[in-house]
Amino acid sequence: MEDTLGSEHSVCLSSWDWKNTAGAFELHSVSSPHSLSPTPSFESYSSSPCPAAAETPYSGGGLVGYGLVDFPPAYLPSPGQARLPKGTKVRMSAQRRRKASEREKLRMRTLADALHTLRNYLPPAYSQRGQPLTKIQTLKCTIKYISELTELLNSVKRA
């Protein structure tokens, strides 16, 4: 892989030392030329494809990076425990998805039947010529029709 990428990338790969770690992860310190600050610094921008190739090694004793072994065991997944990446949804089984789809179809069919019944009870003055009312129009016209019937009943009671 190093040979196909060219000499400029070989510096990056050699700083990782990915070929020489044949065994388990070992605790070792890695000198870091970068700041651990969340704000970007001027030095972090480089025209080089690899920051390690553009900068000189860090000789200060302040910031040191460590390998994977440094993390407490509570933060690492146990061997028998598989973790999904954050944001990944658990997939429903095909049977469960099919049942949910059938329930949703039945719910929509029941709603459509109820709206059709409401449309049949509305007088023709509320319907649009030749076109069935939409769901919202049906509900609004039904509310208006009920309020008109209520006013009519109240006026009869007063007389």
UniProtKB/Swiss-Prot annotation:
Location (main, coarse): nucleus
Region of interest (Disordered), ranges: 79-101
One Gene Ontology term, aspect cellular component: nucleus
Compartments it resides in: Nucleus
Bias (Basic residues) ranges: 86-100
GO molecular function: DNA-binding transcription factor activity, RNA polymerase II-specific; protein dimerization activity; RNA polymerase II cis-regulatory region sequence-specific DNA binding
PROSITE patterns: BHLH (PS50888)
BP-aspect Gene Ontology terms: cell differentiation; mesoderm formation; regulation of transcription by RNA polymerase II
Family annotation (InterPro entries): bHLH_dom (IPR011598), HLH_DNA-bd_sf (IPR036638), Mesogenin/MesP (IPR040259)
Keywords, ordered alphabetically: Developmental protein, Differentiation, DNA-binding, Nucleus, Transcription, Transcription regulation
Alphabetical list of CDD domains matching this protein: bHLH_TS_Msgn1
The keyword Transcription regulation is assigned to this record: yes
Residues in bHLH domain copies: 95-149
Superkingdom assignment: Eukaryota
Described function: Involved in specifying the paraxial, but not dorsal, mesoderm. May regulate the expression of T-box transcription factors required for mesoderm formation and differentiation.
Annotated protein name in UniProt: Mesogenin-1
Chain's gene name: MSGN1
